[in-house]
Amino acid sequence: MSKLEELLAELCPDGVEYVELCDVAHYAKRRIDAREVDESTYVGVENLLQNKMGKTSASTVPATGNVIAFEKGNILIGNLRPYLRKIWLADCNGGTNGDVLAIQINDDNKVSPQFLYYVLSSEQFFAYDAQNSKGAKMPRGDKTAVMKYIIPVPPLPVQ
């Protein structure tokens, strides 16, 4: 039993609802001009740190075109080589590219960003993501499968 399962059993003895990720969150789609981001607010897969260690400043930032906008509280996951376990809970607004999944919560009154980050930074999630990835040399996570990942949704005070 995982630590999360132990806590849920202790704090929610009557059980909790389990839903697919897509029921509580979605991928960011809004685009912004690349000129709106800089080294501290642009997040590419190369500056997400392995083993759930957050991010570092970008060494290169797109000079032209559009990037996918993310907001403070979004969860960014590296979609290339999911076994590297690259994930970050955004502490600012910024932009990213298609190699990073920017997950936005649909309703902050149902799921807190910190709780969702905790669930998605679990070894169970990364094993699921790696199992559903495609490709041999540079596997990519399956965006559809990620949204089908089953997560617990305890009451907000428990989260």
PLM regions and their residue ranges:
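Non-catalytic DNA-recognition/assembly elements of restriction-modification systems
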Residues: 3, 7-32, 156
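Short loop/beta submotifs within extracellular cysteine-rich repeat domains
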Residues: 4-5, 29-33, 50-51, 111, ...
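Sequence-specific dsDNA recognition surfaces
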Residues: 24-32, 41-72, 91
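Short coil/turn segments at secondary-structure boundaries
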Residues: 34-42, 131-132
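A short beta-sheet element
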Residues: 66-68, 72-123, 140
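A short glycine-rich beta-alpha junction/loop motif
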Residues: 80, 95-101, 134-157
